[in-house]
Regions:
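Helix N-cap motif at beta-to-alpha junctions
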Residues: 1-5
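Short alpha-helical segments enriched in small residues
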Residues: 6-188
Length: 188
């Protein structure tokens, strides 16, 4: 592009073509883009457990305005009453840690009244990421070497903006078993 108008046209064409993959220009980081998407679309995010909180809190606490869209555990897993209610819901779940985590994500989202609830299940080689909404949950398994926190932030950004999730991220309706292939680490 040789002129400002041509550059603008090329930028718009790229943004239209790769809307879900592009999250910002210049110095914008993924965490800033996720917070901006939550704020722009008036969405509230909570974490259902301390593991997800650990992934997100350290990154989000440095972003201006994050407290408007993320509870930093205050209304969710760090609140003793909410934690007790979440544990009561999860203790009745059969089938192992994955269905239990899915139930915990759904319960946190409903108890707090948030738009999204994040959760994670750390395993030896990988981490299963959950991002729950009212009707279901996005699930993605990521190798620990692939920075699960950034994948979770990308899932949040895409969900808050109404964009399609990255390939390898599965939509899971509540009450249904998660397919085994969704619990295998995805590579790009």
């Amino acid at each position: 592009a040789e002129t400002p108008a041509a550059l603008s046209k090329a930028r718009k064409a790229l943004a239209d073509r790769f809307a879900a993959e592009l999250y910002g220009e210049g110095e914008m980081t993924l965490v800033h883009a996720a917070v901006q998407a939550l704020e722009t679309h008036h969405r509230l995010l909570v974490c259902c457990d301390a593991d997800a909180g650990t992934l997100l809190e350290a990154r989000m606490e440095t972003v201006a305005g994050a407290e408007k869209v993320f509870d930093f555990g205050a209304m969710s897993y760090a609140d003793a009453k909410v934690r007790e209610k979440l544990s009561a819901k999860v203790c009745r779940v059969k089938g192992g840690p994955v269905p239990a985590k899915l139930t915990r994500v759904r319960a946190a989202q409903r108890l707090v009244g948030a738009d999204f609830a994040a959760g994670c299940l750390e395993r030896a080689e990988d981490t299963v990421l959950f991002l729950g909404s009212r009707k279901g949950c996005w699930v993605r398994t990521v190798a620990n070497a692939d920075t699960p926190a950034l994948w979770l932030l990308d899932m949040i950004r895409r969900a808050a903006s109404g964009l399609p999730q990255a390939a390898g991220t599965r939509w899971q309706k509540y009450g249904r078993a998660i397919p085994a292939d969704a619990l295998t680490a995805q590579r790009l």
